[in-house]
Design a protein with these regions (language model features):
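Structured catalytic-domain cores with a bias toward divalent-metal coordination
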Residues: 1-136
Length: 136
């Protein structure tokens, strides 16, 4: 069985990046397949949020090893740790900004975004041949 992990939260520090919501990519150079899975999820998330109250735009994403998204710089994140597990399919972080995130961030809009995020997660898992059909 494969396990998927998403860390959802507001960032621990405020920088210019934190005016939008975005994904932090995996920082595990020993597992190149994670980048393809992260890319697929981002495509699905972009599609799932299109037309919603809070639209995800991958241009704000920070790949692993870039900017503050470096294990050497911030220590081992929960996602980097999870990606070392043998049954870990993929883990990454979605940061919710301190700004408007492309629209007014309300409780209802946050819930809508969460539902759309889960839709993208399921679609990502369904398109990966390494995931067994019997887990559904």
């Amino acid at each position: 069985m494969k396990v998927f992990f998403i860390d959802l939260h507001s960032p621990w520090s405020r920088t210019n990046e934190h005016e939008w919501y975005y994904c932090l990519g995996p920082d595990n150079p020993d597992r190149p397949e994670l980048d393809a899975r992260w890319r697929r999820f981002r495509e699905e998330l972009s599609s799932a949020t299109a037309g919603g109250p809070l639209v995800y735009d991958p241009k704000w994403d920070i790949p692993g090893g870039v900017g503050y998204n470096q294990s050497e710089r911030m220590g081992t994140s929960s996602c980097a740790w999870f990606n070392r597990l043998p049954n870990g399919w993929c883990a990454f972080c979605i940061e919710y900004g301190y700004g408007l995130c492309g629209g007014v961030f309300t409780r209802e809009r946050g819930r809508d975004l969460g539902r759309r995020c889960m839709r993208a997660t399921v679609r990502s898992l369904l398109h990966d041949p390494s995931v067994d059909d019997d887990v559904w």
